[in-house]
Amino acid sequence: MARHGDTRSPSPVGSTYSSSRRSRRDDDRYERSRRDDGRSYRRSRSPEKRYRDRERDRDSYRRRDRSLDRRADYRDEDTYRPSRRDRSRDRRRSRDRDDDRDYRRRSRDRDFRSRRDDSRDRARRRTDDSADLKHKSRRDDSRERARDSVPRSREASKPSTPAANTGPTDDEKRAERLAKLEAWKQKQAAEKERKQREAAAAGGTRSILDEIDRKSGLSPAVGSPQSSATPIDAAPASYTGKFDPKAIAKNAAPAPAVKSVLGDDIAVPPSAKTSATFPSTKTEVQANKPSATSSKASSLKVKGNVGSFGLGTKQAADTEKASATKTLGFGEEESTRRKLERLPTPPLDDAKDSNKEEDVTAEDEDDDVDMQDGDTEEENAAAARAAAERREERLQNEARDSQSNGDVQMSDASNQKAPDKMEVDAQEEEEVDPLDAFMSELAESAPPKKTAGAKFAKAKPQQPEALFGDENDMDMTAVGDGDADDFLAIANKAKKKKDIPTVDHKKVEYEPFRKKFYTEPSDLAAMSEEEAASLRLELDGIKVRGVEVPRPVSKWSQCGLGVQTLDVIDRLGYSAPTSIQAQAIPAIMSGRDVIGVAKTGSGKTIAFLIPMFRHIKDQRPLENMEGPVGLIMTPTRELATQIHKDCKPFLKALNLRAVCAYGGAPIKDQIADLKRGAEIIVCTPGRMIDLLAANAGRVTNLRRVTYVVLDEADRMFDMGFEPQVMKILANVRPDKQTVLFSATFPRNMEALARKTLNKPVEIVVGGRSVVAPEITQIVEVRSEDKKFIRLLELLGNLYSTDENEDARALIFVERQEGADTLLRELMRKGYPCMSIHGGKDQIDRDSTIEDFKAGIFPVLIATSVAARGLDVKQLKLVVNYDAPNHLEDYVHRAGRTGRAGNTGTAVTFLTEDQERYSVDIAKALKQSGQSVPEPVQKMVDSFLEKVKAGKEKASASGFGGKGLERLDQERDAARMRERKTYKTGDEGEEEEEKEEKNEKAEEQFNKVLSSVQSAAAPSLPGVPKGIDLDGKITVHKTEKDANGSKNPLDKVGSAVADIHARLSRAGVMRSGVPIDNRGPDAGAFHATLEINDFPQKARWAVTNRTNVAKILEATGTSITTKGSFYATGKEPGPGENPKLYILVEGETELSVTNAMRELMRLLKEGTIAAADSDARAPVGGRYNVL
């Protein structure tokens, strides 16, 4: 920080910045006007031009007048002090630089250095230091020449400048500086006391670090103004900045006697702010002074520059310089204190001229102080942070060393090794290359080290991760130290289907709940049994089984419902309960388990929803993370969506919440809805299991479930769904109330369902598996090619009248491929339609159903996925384009029309080879009271005769399902264990079963290979049935053309070779395929492999560029794909290209054999993969496990 007295104007010492700035400009103008013609050259501010002029024109122009007279004119205390030192650090940075000031500053080395630091960008200061040192040395030479060359008369013409180099002037200045120094010392002592009290009061990390420093013996000499009384070595150990050649020269100059105290003086101070920011000023300024003189001045210099920003700082610096002028002979600039950019750079040549340069040295020191104080506080803060980080690192190293195997403590090592370490550092610093030093300075962004050889500075630099080593080791062990078996176990565990644990209900304490809410009205209680039977007969012939079955109701008011529920029922337009509702609602609200079987469109959904709402409202509200109370499971996603939609009118009125969870939709949304809480969940079994197993069972649970509904129960208990449904029911409390509803309920399904019920009441309305009488059923026997024409006729008749303009038509097919094909054909004929099946995305299925219900398109093509539960208004025509394969499916398909008392038509197409399905259709017609057409009856009779003769097996009702492969394997494993345990004597049968399995596997593979042969191949004698991919590979030697040979024996031999090649089993072409490898570039050996009739995946495997490139690189052969592809059953005609095949050519028989073996392996793998993908493809029209 510059003191206020440094100004050229005659203003007082305390002049302000603005007055200093103004006086300097006036002086500059005066000085410029007094220059002679030789000095009228206009100087530019650019450093390039300035350096060039200095080298070329120093003697001729004599622009740099540094004579003692001129210098003495400005040495007066009132006029010599530069005004720029009055400025604060912030104002200096933003100050304008004008030409007048530049003109003056060029005449003095001090101003030249300061202007250089201010005018350039701060980021370039360090880069230009080495170049500046070079010019500084040249400038010193010019000082001697300037003394003799400048005439004395020039100085005499300045009235404001006193005489130069007078002794009294120097004494007066020295006395004033000493007085100011004493005042500054007192102020600094008080300031340090205050800071120490604040630090002691604050405590914390700073106190701990200070204590560690004291224990380490590294307390610096800046603890007090009087702390340093020993001379300092000229080579500071803390230097890590830019390399300076003059620093090396100065390092060699000092006497070796001062090295003993170097380690004590240059150390890490306890204060981050002081030690990190100002590490090396004391050493640099006092480089070559005697120890007696430098002792006091060094301590004052360091303390003043570090801790104070006022008048005392400058006075201390002046006093120090005045005492050093008689002995310090190096007129060089010092390095900046905060950034450590420069080292003391005394030229060896100028040592003898130290007495003549003492004034210049003093001025240079003033300049150095000025530049040191010009740094920003951000740099100070950054240096302080870096010092704190180094202390943290030292603490960590101490902690690590204390836990190591007998390492010496850090404090002892640093105290013992400091002097020797410093000597090593000094030697290394002298030998360092300038480029290496510069690059290392760029690489090190942290402030320079301040340790005098302390050992902790380099303690274990390669192990910074030791702090977190335990955590990293744990992670690495978990992943990297595992065996291959662990990975296999993890992979197998991930592949397993999500499962839910079985609940032990004996260990769970469930809340009691009430089931019975129904109180029989007096008018119904007074009714006799005969009157009740007559009422059931009037209600479509209701049949009931069970003990104490309630009598059916005839009005909604008799059901014991709440006002809100009755209002919603009235708003929906339900005037009176339907047959199933009249009997099922009283039975369910009485707390009984119920099996309800009723025709399609009879209102079964409302029959189980209304009692559920009453059941839920009787229980306490849900708390956080409690599961639902009512659980409704359906077999299809569309039915789940429809039931959820039917719930919505009641949910708002009763203040309840419901969630619809089904596969295909994003599970995250369903999890979020469940976590918010829902009293009702409508779901499919597969997605329900996923939700129960998600997040270790924390998403939802079944502890609160007391009311369970299985809609379309016969399908839910079929082989496909039964394991999942039973798994879910096993996790619900045993005293739950269970309700089953369906339009069809075979006896075998009923027996299975009764195992989950407790004394159920069975309600059957209109018979089991019966089509509603409101539906007109038409069954026609037609060939496959005439069905589409008949379909167009039916659609044309439907939409021919205006009254059916808004009618809908639903067409059922057996398979997904059939649905897409029929969709394409109908759209070509101009009918707007859509298709729905299990192969489509769920969002497409949902949107298609909604659009169909809204009438956006009138025709929908669907598989049996839309056969159950779908309720569409204005649906007047159902066409079974492909006949259903069992009775229940037919009833549900036909039941999509004629709902809620409306009429409809169901048309079914049968082909002549579908005799098996005709039996169930004829049975449905008879049960619904309709006549069976004669062609259909003939088909039924023919099939029954075949059954009697044992040629056909009678079809069973129900889906039957395909079963689950995993369950079949578990049953087989259990049976095998029993056989081995009990030795039942069936071991022979076991061997026979194994042989049968092997035969089946071989037969399956032969079927795959049989698809390779052409359609006409089996009828040709002598041709193999399939290509033997594991057989012997035949490699032929390439025959060269006999140029112009007319020998008939050669032609016969060639023909015989062709015949043998065509009849070989593997590796060559079959009949009609020539071997066109007799060209000039043909290899010595060749083989062919036909791939035309293999599946597409297999052909891709052997023609893929990547696979072929690998074979070429491994074998060195040539592989060429030739021929043309022909569809299955099509043979190439005369003159056409042969079937697609691969030609392999090579120089050796072994290379061709290896290439053929690899191609056959790829072909076999591709064939098996194609067969597996076909087996995994979903079967259209079937229900899949959700």
Curated annotation (Swiss-Prot):
Q: Compositional bias (Low complexity) spans?
A: 8-20, 446-461
Residue limits of the Helicase C-terminal domain? 794-940
Where does the record place the region Disordered? 1-236, 267-461, 954-1001
Task: Specify which residues bind ATP according to the UniProt entry for this protein.
Answer: A598, K599, T600, G601, S602, G603, K604, T605
Question: Where is composition skewed (Acidic residues) in this entry?
Answer: 360-380, 425-434
* Domain remark from Swiss-Prot or TrEMBL: The Q motif is unique to and characteristic of the DEAD box family of RNA helicases and controls ATP binding and hydrolysis.
Give the family, as the similarity comment puts it: Belongs to the DEAD box helicase family. DDX46/PRP5 subfamily.
- Placement of sequence motif Q motif: 554-582
Lineage here is: Eukaryota, Fungi, Dikarya, Ascomycota, Pezizomycotina
Q: Mind telling me what this protein is named? A: Pre-mRNA-processing ATP-dependent RNA helicase prp5
Q: Name one Pfam family in it.
A: KH_12
Q: Name one molecular function that GO assigns to this entry.
A: RNA helicase activity
Q: This protein's superkingdom? A: Eukaryota
A Gene Ontology biological process annotation?
mRNA processing
Q: Which residues form the signal peptide?
A: none
Give the EC number.
3.6.4.13
* Reactions accelerated catalytically: ATP + H2O = ADP + phosphate + H(+)
The EC class name is hydrolase
Give the location in the cell: Nucleus
